[in-house]
Amino acid sequence: MQCPFCQHTDSRVLESRSAEAGQSVRRRRECLQCNRRFTTYERIEFVPITVIKRNQDRELFDRSKLLKGVATACEKTGLTALQLESLVDDVEAELQQQAVREVTSTELGESVLTKLQSLSEVAYVRFASVYRQFRGIRDFVEALDQLKESGDGPLPSVLDEPYEDTAQPTIMISPQ
């Protein structure tokens, strides 16, 4: 390792420890030429993952973009930021474990949907509506039917019953 002070190429390691939750190694070094000490970090270099979009454009996988999309779908569902981070961590880990360095946006979206299904049915339907580009109520009904058939989570029994509008109209009269 080259010394940042004198550019000598030989140094000795004084101390090594795990850093960044085990994602890197912190090493304290001493230059054999000038005897000054410096710190280095050793990290795993991940090969970037490319996402192939629907229009065949390619862009680098962006964790923050995925997290933002998932967070939007999960607004007001009671899911914590930690749960969302964990979901995105799982998706990213699956991508890193694949031998192929390209993934289609379809595969990425389906991976997210699979994980959302067990966390929140509302978030699942919201994410699916954007990802699958729902065009009408029929698309929502089909997504709900898929959830119901999968049996992965407890769907409210209200979905088994036909919808009846029992709300009474409210008439407001304002004094003049």
Swiss-Prot record:
Sequence ranges assigned to domain ATP-cone in this UniProt record: 49-139
Keywords: ATP-binding, DNA-binding, Metal-binding, Nucleotide-binding, Repressor, Transcription, Transcription regulation, Zinc, Zinc-finger
Zinc finger motifs (unnamed), residue ranges: 3-34
Chain ranges passing through the membrane: none
Co-factor binding comment: Binds 1 zinc ion.
One of the GO biological process terms: negative regulation of DNA-templated transcription
Keyword field contains Transferase: no
Biased composition (Polar residues): 167-176
Summary of the function given for this chain in its UniProt record: Negatively regulates transcription of bacterial ribonucleotide reductase nrd genes and operons by binding to NrdR-boxes.
NCBIfam families noted in UniProt: transcriptional regulator NrdR (TIGR00244)
Name the UniProt record assigns to this protein: Transcriptional repressor NrdR
Organism: Acaryochloris marina (strain MBIC 11017)
Gene: nrdR
